[in-house]
Amino acid sequence: MGAAGDVTGYDMPPLMLTPDEIEAAVLGAQWVAGRGDPVLAKAARDLISKIASAVPERLRPYVLEPATGAPPAWTTAPDGLDIARTRAWIHAGRKIRLDYRDERGTVSQRVIWPVTVGYRETVRMLIGWCELRQAFRTFRTDRVVEAEFLDERHGQRPGQLRTRWQKHLEAEHAAWKAQTP
């Protein structure tokens, strides 16, 4: 069973990729291999191997000797929760209870409806609807003290929740632009 809990894989129809598309896929996979959670990082390395074995010989240098590269993130902070399981809960539309330590060291308990896991250069972020604050919030995964993966569903399809979050981001950005000279 895959990380999402319901899909293990499938046979992808043949794709005709340009050299630029191959390099883009490899670059993205390199970045994830260096910064993703262990399950996603392994999947990214496997993807590069699959691309290398599937492309014609004349295109293999774009995979094995690309002109672009993503250096590994040597200082990624350790996560306080299982990110692969978090991704599965996002797909399933289930809630997560967090004991979360803020930047001042204060610990609070939050129940969130997880939306997405975001990646910064050295830290991962969990974005979710916070029941306590009744708003979308961003939680650094290295500040999670404890996580309980609840069986309770939050009642929205993951795509609907993500759309709400994206609209929230757009509104925040518009408000910021209106205040910026």
Language-model features and meaning:
Residues 1-181:
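Short glycine- and basic-residue-enriched patches
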